[in-house]
């Protein structure tokens, strides 16, 4: 598992790159503020209920949460179940809002 910075992710989004973003927060957190992607709460990943993203196993996926802790857990679990190109957003949405406003 590797990390991606807020500035690198923002640059890639601004360039129009199609990214596979996975928000591992809870639905209410996602609804409050998100940067897109698929909502798959950490609990679903930990119980391997990942049907909505199973077709991404060989593609780059970028996990994010509020602070980077849940997405770190999710990233490690995704690697355990066969995902090969997992990135974790450093600092999560807290860092995003701090740096991007």
Where would I find each of the regions flagged by the language model?
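Rhodanese-like catalytic fold shared by cysteine-dependent sulfurtransferases
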Residues: 1-20, 24-62, 66-101
């Amino acid at each position: 598992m590797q990390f991606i910075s807020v500035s690198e992710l923002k640059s890639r989004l601004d360039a129009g790159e199609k990214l596979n973003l996975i928000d591992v927060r809870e639905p209410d957190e996602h609804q409050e503020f998100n940067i897109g992607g698929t909502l798959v709460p950490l609990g679903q990943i930990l119980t391997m209920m990942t049907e909505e993203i199973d077709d991404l196993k060989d593609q780059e996926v970028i996990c994010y949460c509020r602070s980077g802790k849940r997405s770190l857990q999710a990233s490690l679990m995704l690697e355990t179940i066969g995902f090969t190109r997992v990135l974790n957003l450093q600092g999560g949405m807290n860092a995003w809002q701090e740096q991007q406003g």
